[in-house]
């Protein structure tokens, strides 16, 4: 078997064959009576998501490059890869009511970007609709299909590594292994993750200051922004050309050091 594999490799890829022979030589696997172990291949099982109501809609990535929904997200710096996980709904109220009666009527219906909320298995339990109308009084509408915590990104995180917690779904797209809280009443206690909280950079905002203080007191790690960063949220930082991932990595604090940095950062 090893002989046939060797000749197969020699016929198909001579440079790789030469490298293979050299590795065998350096490992003492050449010469008379030597048996080369058969190569072992490891394949990860493919993951398939169950179809859900979002599949009725068109993905943002499939829209024309001049489409307002696609342009809005591209202008915010969101990558093509992430556009594949967001959807466009031309009639938000009508589509929502077709699956769960939420609105009394569909008057003044509008088009919205659909941000799916999925659990760790990838099953849809809710969604947010982001209005494309800059004058809308309700920029975000959250619809829950099941009684779950309003968290975006659970299906994408690796729980064995640090999980970054940000304040909005779009911000989470700029940070690896991140989830977003889609409401002020989100309870993360049911998740056994090593959290790092990344709140907005608003040292004069009393609510945000209290949230950071609470996270530190509960023993969590937090990001405290350097004074030279003037932008309020991660999206604005990305648009300003800041390397957000490096900036976050270099400004994670916990315990007493977090307290000292926090007290120096806050303005209220």
Positions of predicted regions on the chain:
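Non-catalytic accessory segments of DNA primases and related replication-initiation nucleases
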Residues: 1-92, 110, 134-136, 203-206, ...
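Phosphate-handling DNA/RNA-contact segment within nucleic-acid enzymes
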Residues: 93-194, 199, 208-209
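Short, surface-exposed amphipathic charged segments that create phosphate/polyanion-binding patches used
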Residues: 103-104, 191-196, 233-246
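Short active-site-adjacent structural elements
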Residues: 189, 205-208, 232-235
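Conserved catalytic-core subdomain
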Residues: 195, 199-201, 209-211, 246, ...
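A generic structural motif
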Residues: 221-231
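Extended, charge-rich low-complexity interaction segments
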Residues: 245-268
């Amino acid at each position: 078997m090893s002989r046939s594999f060797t000749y197969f490799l020699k016929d198909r890829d001579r440079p790789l064959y030469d490298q293979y022979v050299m590795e065998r030589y350096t490992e003492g696997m050449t010469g008379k009576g030597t048996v080369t172990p058969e190569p072992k291949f490891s394949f990860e099982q493919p993951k398939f998501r169950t179809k859900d109501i979002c599949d009725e809609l068109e993905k943002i990535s499939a829209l024309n490059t001049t489409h307002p929904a696609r342009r809005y997200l591209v202008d915010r710096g969101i990558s093509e890869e992430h556009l594949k996980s967001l959807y466009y709904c031309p009639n938000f109220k009508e589509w929502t009511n077709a699956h769960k009666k939420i609105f009394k009527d569909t008057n003044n219906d509008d088009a919205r970007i659909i941000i799916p909320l999925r659990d760790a298995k990838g099953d849809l339990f809710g969604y947010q609709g982001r209005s494309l109308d800059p004058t809308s009084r309700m920029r975000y509408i959250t619809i829950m299909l099941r009684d779950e915590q309003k968290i975006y990104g659970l299906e994408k995180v690796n729980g064995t590594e640090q999980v970054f917690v940000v304040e909005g779904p779009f911000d989470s797209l700029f940070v690896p292994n991140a989830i977003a809280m889609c409401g002020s009443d989100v309870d993360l206690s049911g998740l056994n993750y090593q959290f790092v909280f990344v709140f907005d950079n608003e040292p004069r905002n009393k609510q945000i200051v209290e949230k950071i203080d609470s996270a530190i007191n509960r023993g969590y790690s937090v990001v405290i922004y350097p004074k030279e960063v003037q932008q309020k949220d991660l999206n604005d930082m990305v648009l300003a050309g800041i390397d957000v991932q490096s900036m976050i990595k270099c400004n994670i604090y916990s315990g007493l050091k977090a307290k000292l940095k926090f007290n120096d950062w806050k303005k209220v």
